[in-house]
Amino acid sequence: DKKINILEIGTWKGASVASFYHYFKKAIIFCIDKNYKFQFKSNRVKFFKCDTEKLNEVYDFNNYLEENKINYFDVIIDDGSHNYQDILNNFQRFFKKIKSGGYYIIEDFRHHKIHPNYVNDTPSNSIDIDEILINLNKKELFKSTILDHEFQNYCFDVISNIKTHKGIQEFSFIVFIQKK
């Protein structure tokens, strides 16, 4: 029952947000999605139309956070496009906003491996997300067109734990990245 800030990237109609709202009674929940299909309203739920592929929209969202003195999130959930490049770009843009002890969660990060028709935008010269998570855990630098060595070293310094879990559905893989 403590006050926490949650950010969900990719809210769709807001079903997850509704469960967060009822479970975390004092949470302020921020939702960003490029489509407005959101079906819930509350003074504790803030929806922003934001396509995280468009830097100007991310910039506007960050300005809103700064203007309202929202400096951190206890939890950030990336349930957005599930595409490789979007996942890594979101991680680089938002992970620093996690409070100490908080979690950055990535849902369904193996979609392109399981659904052959799903967009696989993994560059041929890049390692996949599973390998990135292993390297982050081992604190070993890796080649990436998105996560530069400066950001990787930041992660090595602040990540305390990385846990991957298999969900009930075939494509459901989720990772919890905890910040020290």
Predicted regions and their residues:
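S-adenosylmethionine/decaboxylated-SAM
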Residues: 1-180
